């Protein structure tokens, strides 16, 4: 009888422990916090549970210095720093500590850097990084010769194709040129991006390039494609609202005819390096040893600047 009671008690205790373990696992799954008590785990707990970004950065630094999941710690710390308007510090951290990170993490760090450069208005560095990433894709380096790669957003994994990545990078490059008032370069990039994977947001940006150059009718045609649902993403409310605002801006600008001086403004000066690379890559014929998937995108090589 006593043995039976002891066995029942042990089973009860084991059941409680099992339930506690399940609850603990469920907690980490729900809050997307890793298990354990390492510096990186403490950093994620401070970031996601305690909502204390300053403390999270302290623990991220400890994780980096002790070699605890350095890839994730550096990237996550940079994201938190950006949220705290410490983007310049985040840029220097990535540049200083990325040599400690694995080769597979470099692409993710580049993407964080692109956002940080944009946040800080460091357009020249953003443009150079975007061009380098586009060259890597064309040369077959970025995807390890595969047609897709796995990306992560908000804790969820998804597949990204070569074409989607090219379109995304070209979109970012076009926007960077826009901030530099290099509207012809931006136009060329957006047109190539639309050839790879058309979407309504890039159509709006292309229309803005044309409006800035006084090419109102061309801009109207591009906006019509959005407002008539002829491009992907045209049903998005914010995109449609932006297209309508651009159309209003266009119509208000129509009475002001473009004069000869407009040809000399900074916005109509094409990036010389961009043109040179465009012409050289268009005129150059060569045989490639790359995988077929990269041969399929060879028609887009003139988006890259040598």
Curated annotation (Swiss-Prot):
Q: Does the keyword Nucleus apply?
A: yes
Superkingdom as given in the UniProt entry? Eukaryota
Q: Which PROSITE patterns does the record cross-reference, listed alphabetically?
A: TPR, TPR_REGION
Its localization reads: Nucleus
Per-repeat ranges for TPR: 1-22, 71-104, 107-140, 167-200, 202-233, 270-304
An annotated GO BP: regulation of sulfur utilization
> What is the induction note for this entry?
Induced in response to sulfur deprivation.
* Keyword match Repeat: yes
Q: Name one Pfam family in it.
A: TPR_8
The record, for Gene3D superfamilies, names: Tetratricopeptide repeat domain
Q: What happens when the gene is disrupted?
A: Maintain higher tissue sulfate concentrations under sulfur-limiting conditions.
Role noted for this protein: Involved in the utilization of stored sulfate under sulfur-deficient conditions.
**Alphabetically ordered keywords of this record:** Coiled coil, Nucleus, Repeat, TPR repeat
Could you identify this protein by its name? Protein SULFUR DEFICIENCY-INDUCED 1
Predominant location: nucleus
Instruction: Provide the coiled-coil residue spans.
Output: 72-139, 238-260
Q: Name one GO cellular component term.
A: transcription repressor complex
Family that this chain belongs to: Belongs to the MS5 protein family.
What InterPro entries does its record include?
MS5/SDI1, TPR-like_helical_dom_sf, TPR_rpt
| Lineage of the species this protein comes from | Eukaryota, Viridiplantae, Streptophyta, Embryophyta, Tracheophyta
């Amino acid at each position: 009888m006593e043995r039976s009671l002891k066995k029942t008690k042990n089973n009860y205790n084991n059941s409680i422990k099992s339930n506690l373990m399940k609850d603990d696992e469920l907690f980490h799954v729900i809050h997307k916090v890793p298990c354990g008590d390492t510096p990186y785990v403490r950093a994620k707990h401070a970031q996601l549970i305690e909502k204390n970004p300053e403390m999270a950065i302290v623990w991220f630094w400890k994780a980096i210095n002790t070699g605890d999941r350095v890839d994730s710690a550096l990237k996550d710390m940079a994201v938190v720093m950006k949220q705290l308007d410490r983007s310049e510090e985040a840029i220097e951290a990535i540049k200083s500590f990325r040599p400690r990170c694995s080769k597979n993490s470099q692409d993710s760090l580049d993407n964080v850097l692109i956002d940080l450069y944009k946040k800080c208005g460091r357009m020249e560095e953003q443009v150079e990084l975007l061009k380098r990433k586009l060259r890597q894709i064309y040369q077959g380096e970025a995807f390890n010769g595969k047609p897709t790669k796995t990306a992560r957003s908000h804790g969820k994994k998804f597949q990204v194709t070569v074409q989607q990545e090219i379109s995304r990078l070209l979109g970012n490059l076009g926007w960077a040129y826009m901030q530099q008032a290099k509207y012809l370069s931006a136009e060329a990039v957006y047109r190539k991006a639309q050839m790879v994977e058309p979407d309504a947001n890039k159509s709006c940006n292309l229309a803005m390039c044309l409006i800035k150059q006084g090419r109102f009718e061309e801009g109207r045609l591009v906006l019509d494609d959005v407002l008539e649902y002829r491009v992907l993403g045209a049903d998005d409310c914010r995109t449609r609202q932006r297209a309508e605002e651009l159309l209003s801006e266009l119509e208000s600008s129509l009475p002001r005819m473009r004069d000869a001086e407009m040809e000399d403004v900074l916005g109509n000066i094409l990036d010389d390096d961009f043109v040179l690379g465009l012409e050289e890559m268009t005129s150059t014929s060569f045989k490639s040893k790359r995988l077929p998937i990269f041969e399929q995108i060879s028609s887009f090589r003139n988006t890259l600047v040598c």
